[in-house]
């Protein structure tokens, strides 16, 4: 994507824009890493110490209205709701960030790619000034998450969609196999700081989960030595998702309810005990997740795609992507935002239903009603009462977004069809791909539109569903792209017959 001329210009820009602080950061990157990269980090003067960047909790309603009410909370406070019961949002001092121009930020973020200097080797913490600027490097709990590849879906785009510029952001290529790592590194790092400042304020961290959040929470808490508790809906997550928190030492509670029931319970528990809430109702996680949007811009050499399609369940991630793109636009790193698509499973589609009733996003809030989610292969988005509904609606309105749905057969067929072109998709990515197929069929998305599908988890976490599909063992589903194994005898003739049949030899 990047030409030699562009690379030369970028290199020149880095040299021209280098300040004493950025040059010191670059010098660290050029040195050999010490045995203890945390100790090495302590020897540096962090960028945020040289500047006056800060962040705090404010009511999300202030962000919606564009008017600051004056209500705010320190990120060191254990607080999840505003005084009126609404959600909170992490608000950055944009004026302070804007004092350093877009060339400065682009050069700084680009310079941190590929380093092992703590903590900037992480795709999240390479944007630390835009995430948690006041956090000490020594408090950070990171597994060098992020920096996931942007897969050019050349063959799938051409053959299935007639598209020339289709990409898949592989957020599932991460430590625990899902995008949830991006948010959990931020939340657990802040908890690590709070526990040091106020030793008895937090005894454990808990979450309700459809599988991926619990895996990320348990892994990051284990790395930090912090106890974790996960509430899982019984028999509604994959075996791979279940075993992850068990292996990482979490207290795993398998509860006879759905995700929404687990969510109600964890909110009650965290309200009455010193257990910290890790669900996306806590906006700290969204600060990490927004960095995937910034990564996409970096990977396109700071060019903005036309469309970004995101699977939606609890709906925090679409707001996180919106926030990342919005910050880049407001600070001048790019001059526009992509249009956003929220893709929901038909069996858990309250936002899609509201979008259809409202005939668009303008009056979508008035049309919204929670639903009772039905079973879906896309189990991580099997949510009927999403916590971040207001966040998602704001994102869709501001980004001229749309909402699409996918049936069980559509999502499984889309995932399997794309798998045949070199991918290995989770069912949630199948939802997004199925939505894209529909939008192309209606010509909402053009053949030459640069489009990014966000893949939220690794397909290996959902191997059971793939086995069922390719075995044609899914009731009431034709499984048209199934590729079942062929059983043959230990005989050359039988083997040759199978090969000839397959390849018409």
Provide a role label for each language-model segment.
Residues 1-21:
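N-terminal chloroplast transit peptides
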Residues 1-4, 23-44:
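N-terminal mitochondrial targeting presequences
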Residues 6, 14-16, 31, 105, ...:
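Intrinsically disordered, low-complexity, compositionally biased regions/tails
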Residues 9, 13, 24-26, 67-68, ...:
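Serine/proline-rich low-complexity intrinsically disordered segments, especially terminal tails, linkers
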Residues 12, 30-33, 206, 401:
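Small side chains
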Residues 15, 23-26, 35, 88, ...:
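Residue-level marker of intrinsically disordered, low-complexity segments enriched
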Residues 37-505:
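PLP-dependent amino-acid enzyme catalytic core
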């Amino acid at each position: 994507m990047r030409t030699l001329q562009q690379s030369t210009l970028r290199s020149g820009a880095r040299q021209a824009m280098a300040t004493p602080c950025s040059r010191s950061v670059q010098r660290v990157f050029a040195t050999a890493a010490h045995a203890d990269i945390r100790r090495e980090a302590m020897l540096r003067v962090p960028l945020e110490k040289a500047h006056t960047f800060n962040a705090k909790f404010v009511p999300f309603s202030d962000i919606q209205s564009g008017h600051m009410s004056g209500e705010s909370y320190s990120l060191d406070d254990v607080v999840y709701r505003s005084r009126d019961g609404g959600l909170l949002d992490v608000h950055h001092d944009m004026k302070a960030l804007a004092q350093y121009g877009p060339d400065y930020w682009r050069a700084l973020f680009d310079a941190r790619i590929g380093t092992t200097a703590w903590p900037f080797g992480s795709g999240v913490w390479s944007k630390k000034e835009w995430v948690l600027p006041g956090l000490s490097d020594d408090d950070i709990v990171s597994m060098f998450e992020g920096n996931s590849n942007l897969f050019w879906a050349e063959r799938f785009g051409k053959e299935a969609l007639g598209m020339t510029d289709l990409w898949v952001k592989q957020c599932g290529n991460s430590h625990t196999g899902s995008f949830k790592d991006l948010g959990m590194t931020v939340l657990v790092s802040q908890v690590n700081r709070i526990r040091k400042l106020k030793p008895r304020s937090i005894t454990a961290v808990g979450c309700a989960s459809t599988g991926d959040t619990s895996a990320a929470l348990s892994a990051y808490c284990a790395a930090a030595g912090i106890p974790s508790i996960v509430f899982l809906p019984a028999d509604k997550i994959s075996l791979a998702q279940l075993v992850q928190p068990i292996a990482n030492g979490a207290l795993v509670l398998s509860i006879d309810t759905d995700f929404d029931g687990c969510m109600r319970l964890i909110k009650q528990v965290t309200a009455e005990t010193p257990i910290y809430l890790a669900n996306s109702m806590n906006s700290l996680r969204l600060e990490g997740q927004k960095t995937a949007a910034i990564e996409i811009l970096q990977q396109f050499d700071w060019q903005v795609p036309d469309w970004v399609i995101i699977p939606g369940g609890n709906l925090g991630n679409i707001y996180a992507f919106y926030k990342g793109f919005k910050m880049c636009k407001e600070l001048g790193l790019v001059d526009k935002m992509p249009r956003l698509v929220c893709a929901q499973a038909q069996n858990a589609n309250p936002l899609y239903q509201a979008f259809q009733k409202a005939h668009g996003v303008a009056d979508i809030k008035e049309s919204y009603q929670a639903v009772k989610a039905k079973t879906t292969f896309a189990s991580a988005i099997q949510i009927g009462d999403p916590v971040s509904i207001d966040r998602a609606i704001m994102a869709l309105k501001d980004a001229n977004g749309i909402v699409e749905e996918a049936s069980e057969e559509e999502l499984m067929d889309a995932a399997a069809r794309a798998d045949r072109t070199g991918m290995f998709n989770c069912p949630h990515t199948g939802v997004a791909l199925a939505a894209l197929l529909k939008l192309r069929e209606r010509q909402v998305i053009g053949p030459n539109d640069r489009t990014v599908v966000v893949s939220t988890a690794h397909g290996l976490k959902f191997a059971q569903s793939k086995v069922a599909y390719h075995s044609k063992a899914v009731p009431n589903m034709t499984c048209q792209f199934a590729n079942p194994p062929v059983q043959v005898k230990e005989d050359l003739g039988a083997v040759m017959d199978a090969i000839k049949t397959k390849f018409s030899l």
